[in-house]
Amino acid sequence: MTKKRKLKPRVIAIAGFAPDSRDQVNEEPDTSEIWAINNAYLFLKRTPNRWFQLHPPDWKRNEGMPAGSYGREPEHLELLKESPCPVYMQVKTPDIPSSVEYPLGDLVERFGRTYFTSTMAYIMALILAEHDDGQNVGEVRVYGINLTTMNEYFRQKACFEYWIGQAEGRGIKVWVPASSGLLKAGLYAREAVSDDVVTMTEERCEAWRQR
């Protein structure tokens, strides 16, 4: 009887847009999968394996972005239409042949939690679902994602870190760059927190309360 060949664990690199580490994703070997968000094509040197554009078509219309371009410049829509890789979207879109509806309902039912405050959270949940279904993932590498701007810090960072914890709980290694603000903080009751960090946090909290 022929032995079934054991596949090597998958390595998935998430390509975000923060400039301090995003270009490092281009150093990934061809064996790594690249899962890219929004307009990461501006710096990627190869076609990603999957692309995620999970915003509504008229996102940021009130900020001057053109209608139907998903909150980006007009050429963004054209690139979506021409994408050779699957493009995960809220719904399958006829004008974008490679579009795939993101399976939100299935993932909420599977994980029993409706907690997705960023594209990165959606991505990590999909990775976990595939891993749980036997498509073994050994490592996730996170490039270009800091989540330290006002909105990201308060609304998105904790959620993405929650899903990172879910991955690590399954034995999946998660790597983040030293420059990223993810998974970093002083030890409670053991390390002094700098006044600069305290001031910054207080200012952010006050601004958040006044919204």
Where are these regions (language model features)?
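Metal-ion/cofactor- or nucleotide/acyl-coenzyme-handling active-site neighborhoods
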Residues: 1-211
